[in-house]
C-alpha cells in the first residue's frame, strides 16, 4: 500500500532572490502529479534545488536567479491503511502527530550523515516486509517496501525441511546467514 516516485518542479523567482514562498511554490509544482484517489501523500522529501542550471543546492533561500527548480521524492500510502493506523493508536489514548514511512524512520535512527552523503542502501528485513531506502548526496533517492521478509523465509524453510514453523524459525535464527563469506563452508542447509 506504499508507493514512491521522484518528481520535479520549476517556477520563476519573483524578486530575483529566492524567498521562502518561492520554495513553497516550487515544491507545490513538484507535487502536482496525478495520485490515485485511494492514495495520500505521506512525504515530500527534497533532494536538491537548482537555480538557473546551478544544481546540488540544498538551501536556496537568499540566493539570486531567475528560475528555481526542485527535485523531490514523493511517498504515498493507502488512505484506508493510514486511517486505520491512526484510529488504532488513538484508541490506545495516544495522539498521532504524523505518519512516517518505516525505511525513512530507520534511516534517521541508524544512518550517519556521512553515510547518507557518500551513498548508502538501508535494507531492513522485518517479519512481514523488507524495507529499502537509498541515499546519495545527503538526499533520499528511492524507497520501497517489499512484502517478502523473515516470515516468508521461515515458511520456506518449514516447507523445504517439512518441519514445524517454530523449528524452522529456530533454524533460521541459529544457522541463517545473509553474507556468504560469513557462512561455514563445511555446513550445508
Predicted stretch roles:
Residues 1-122, 139-141, 150, 161-189:
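Nucleotide/phosphate-binding catalytic cleft detector across ATP-hydrolyzing
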Residues 127:
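Short, glycine/acidic-enriched loop or turn micro-motifs at the edges of active sites
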Residues 136-137, 147:
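A short beta-strand motif that forms part of the nucleic acid-binding face
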Residues 131-134:
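Short beta-strand scaffold segments in enzyme catalytic cores
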Residues 143-145:
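Residue-level detector of high-confidence beta-strand sites
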